[in-house]
Amino acid sequence: MILFPAVDIKDGRCVRLRQGRADAETVFSDDPAAMARHWQDQGAKWLHVIDLDGAFSGMPANFELIRRICADLSVPVQLGGGIRDEATAKAYLDAGVERLIIGTVALEEPDLYARLCATFPGRIGVSLDAEGGRLKTKGWVADSGLTVDDVLPRLLAAGTAFVIYTDIDRDGMQTGVNLSALERLAGMCPVPVIAAGGVATLEDVRALYPMTLTSSVEGAITGRAIYTGTLDLHAAMEWIAAQ
């Protein structure tokens, strides 16, 4: 099981949003690169980095900072936010990002998404961000009108390497993972599935762990909980290693 600590970047700072709302922001550090190193030092095997400015604007906004984070770390980085053309994808991969998370393009520009998967095999994943069962785009501010069932077969056929499932209703709310929705999605996915939204305590990690042994669930992204201290990342990593 992999726990992915989240480093969300907005205005050059490390922040967390509640339910993706830009007006519900908490700043946790003025130095995202130092924060990324801290999570690596705590035992993280991967980092989950989101360019929130890019997600809202549709173009990269923190490229140099993200390049520096990748250069500083010895663990791989997965990155999302504002990746909406091939040139941006290539630039980030060349800068040291291990794999890319595509959201808006995957739903709105299927031909471009398929081309990204073909051009960078094994390195392109999709973020399915659901609120009330409907998928959101453009930094979670637009309703696509689509559901997971509508889009998943096409995304898998295109060559999706991994799937991140965000339950927006639980994002930043620290209410536990939506295990039933995750289990249903994993049953439809032959590629790794990563849960996002709701991981708040070691109990949530323990509840999710069995699913990583019996399904395609690879792990979970954790954000607010490790910043506020309701989840001790180092202790969680040690618990996983002991299983």
Swiss-Prot record:
First-listed, main subcellular location of the protein, grouped into a coarse class: cytoplasm
Gene Ontology annotations of biological process type: L-histidine biosynthetic process; L-tryptophan biosynthetic process
Enzyme class: isomerase
Annotated TM spans: none
Classification via InterPro entries: Aldolase_TIM (IPR013785), His_biosynth (IPR006062), HisA_bact_arch (IPR006063), Isoase_HisA-like (IPR044524), Isoase_HisA-like_bact (IPR023016), RibuloseP-bd_barrel (IPR011060)
Keywords noted in UniProt: Amino-acid biosynthesis, Cytoplasm, Histidine biosynthesis, Isomerase
Classification via Pfam families: His_biosynth (PF00977)
Superkingdom, natural source: Bacteria
Subcellular location: Cytoplasm
GO cellular component, one term: cytoplasm
Pathway assigned in UniProt: Amino-acid biosynthesis; L-histidine biosynthesis; L-histidine from 5-phospho-alpha-D-ribose 1-diphosphate: step 4/9
Enzyme Commission number(s) from the entry: 5.3.1.16
GO molecular function: 1-(5-phosphoribosyl)-5-[(5-phosphoribosylamino)methylideneamino]imidazole-4-carboxamide isomerase activity
Active site (record annotation): 8, 129
Reaction(s) this enzyme catalyzes, per UniProt: 1-(5-phospho-beta-D-ribosyl)-5-[(5-phospho-beta-D-ribosylamino)methylideneamino]imidazole-4-carboxamide = 5-[(5-phospho-1-deoxy-D-ribulos-1-ylimino)methylamino]-1-(5-phospho-beta-D-ribosyl)imidazole-4-carboxamide
Record family assignment: Belongs to the HisA/HisF family.
Protein's name according to its UniProt entry: 1-(5-phosphoribosyl)-5-[(5-phosphoribosylamino)methylideneamino] imidazole-4-carboxamide isomerase
Species this protein is from: Nitratidesulfovibrio vulgaris (strain DSM 19637 / Miyazaki F)
Gene encoding the protein: hisA
